[in-house]
Amino acid sequence: YEEQRKQYEERLNEEKRRREEDKREAEEKHRVSEEPYFVFKNSKVVSNSNSEQTILRMEFLNKGRGAAYCIIPDLECIAKRMDMSEFTISRYEAVQDPIAMVGEAFVMVMSYDKDEKNFFRMTPTIKFEDDSGRKYKQTFEIDISDRLGNGIIINYAQPELCEE
């Protein structure tokens, strides 16, 4: 009788383990089906930039499978000049529309000193949530290649699931 009880408990534990594994797998499939995914579309220097700051308007497109909510780009990001020395680029204004449905663009406006060179690599990070409130971040590497602010994407940043 004791042996049967032991086997029964082992079967129950194995069943419980399988159910938990199936549940995790289903949750991951659901998460991936809702995951927003930003791609860099373009950037340009805004012509009404004041005399001390250069204003850079950057556009990203949500090409994921779900909407992105509570979009918050970093307040600052580090940029590297061609000689590998660093300077800071700051967010110039608050996000005008913190929601990007699939196929919609999201605009981020940054600024940096007018004295900086026109050729540099920046690494902005964008944080956002999906439909279920899961938090993500995506860090891009973008080369600004001329005085007009035209950008070239260097990496294909994947959304990373953030810990709470």
Please describe what each predicted stretch is.
Residues 62, 75-79, 126-132, 144-146:
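Beta-strand elements of well-folded, non-transmembrane domains
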Residues 1-66:
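Membrane-proximal alpha-helical anchors
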Residues 118-133, 137:
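Serine/threonine-enriched low-complexity regions used as flexible
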Residues 34, 38-43, 47, 73, ...:
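Generic structural motif
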Residues 51-57, 105-106, 121-122:
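Short, solvent-exposed loop/turn segments enriched in Ser/Thr/Gly
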Residues 131-164:
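Acidic, serine/threonine- and proline-rich intrinsically disordered appendage/tail regions
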Residues 65-75:
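Short, hydrophobic/aromatic beta-strand segments
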Residues 78-116:
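Intrinsically disordered, low-complexity Pro/Gly/Ser/Thr-rich segments with frequent PxxP/GP/PP motifs
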